[in-house]
Amino acid sequence: MLTPERHQLIIDQIEKHDVVKIQELINLTNASESTIRRDLSTLEERGFLKRVHGGAAKLSDIRLEPDMLEKSSKNLHDKLKIAEKAASLLEEGDCIYLDAGTTTLHMIDFMDKTKDIVVVTNGVMHIDALIRKEISFYLLGGYVKHRTGAIIGGASLVAMDQYRFDKSFLGTNGVHTEAGFTTPDPDEALLKQKAIKQAKHAYVLADPSKFGEISFSAFAGIGDATIITTDAEELTFDNYQEKTVVKVVKP
């Protein structure tokens, strides 16, 4: 079987079954395990699939955006570990940006209010947590997305112009070596771009499920931010560590 034929067969199997095992592909193609692994690596780089332990899986819909309830209940343990690590990076007097999202929301619980930190955020859900923690903050104005509680749009971009940050902490829907960091909403991508540009240090908080995924709108290249994630048996970070810093937390 020629390589293009084999690649198409793999793509077809993933479209049909969502997840496919390496051994199943070996049986279907009569190719060696090393050949199938190379095929999966190539197809992942091209954005056709993402590799998982023992095989490959279908990518999510590039425009699909889960709501806050769905996000908050998914991979909670990983998100808490990532949030704790991110909060540990904060220093006395830091001015930071917290993106709207569940992991950045969890960060607030781990923040030390005695460090005199000032927060700028576009997260409506972050308001109560920041007030309870007695942390000084500024809320961007603009259009509020009902599904996620994120404030976006022209007004929020204009408001961002007046701020400069020591550190920005952002969520993402996709992390990919070639496509970079991506999100379903182009308006939200613009705000994330500005948050990275106006920070001395930018951090993307991503649990392992985000790796290999590509969403509709890119907001940064893979080398534009440090990644904070958790260790995962089925995932290797070698390709990412060639292009950026990856801080891996033990789950």
Swiss-Prot record:
The keyword Membrane does not apply. One of its GO terms (biological process) is regulation of DNA-templated transcription. One of its GO terms (molecular function) is cis-regulatory region sequence-specific DNA binding. Residues 20-39 bind DNA. SUPFAM superfamilies: NagB/RpiA/CoA transferase-like, Winged helix' DNA-binding domain. It comes from the Bacteria. The keyword Repressor applies. Residues 3-58 form the HTH deoR-type domain. Keywords: DNA-binding, Repressor, Transcription, Transcription regulation. PANTHER family: HTH-TYPE TRANSCRIPTIONAL REGULATOR SRLR-RELATED (PTHR30363), TRANSCRIPTIONAL REGULATOR, DEOR FAMILY (PTHR30363:SF56). This is Uncharacterized HTH-type transcriptional regulator FruR. It comes from Bacillus subtilis (strain 168).
